[in-house]
């Protein structure tokens, strides 16, 4: 585990939910909806790897999720449909929408999490740096790495002190937030064809 506190804030999956998984899998099978799991990999990594493979084959992809982390997968071929209020309100993330909403590109989502943190994933980020400040820094420097290359140019301030003190935390959080797109999947695109009616 790269960051010892990672996932510490997450509650363990409730037993009553775990007990339902076999039934959910059977139900998905009945409807011809494919499912897949890979030991030591998160669902995000499987989705990231499979969407990259689908893009190579020219597919248009829509990822439906309630997890904002997946917006880093947005491309001209991949849209992330983020459920905002259950499934009654859905926000469609494209590169343009992300740029209009936050002023950053999909590749900067992990930089944003590295600087501002993310309470839902227990990423602390840099002390006293919120989303607004992080976005301003990313608009100016592009990436966390580039920001730290120019840290000596910052005027003396509390923010500069926090950035220097929390450099390793920022880089670790960025790394943890990065969805792997090279998971060793044992399935291909043909294996996830919808088989239902």
Give the ranges of each region predicted by the language model:
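Alpha-helix/helix-capping structural signal
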Residues: 68-69, 132
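Noncatalytic, basic helical substrate-engagement surface that gates or grips nucleic-acid strands
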Residues: 1-64, 70-94, 169-196
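Hydrophobic alpha-helical scaffolding
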Residues: 14-17, 88, 102, 124-127, ...
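Accessory alpha-helical DNA-binding modules that contact the DNA backbone or grooves
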Residues: 105-108, 116-175, 183-186
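A short, charged helix-loop
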Residues: 87-120
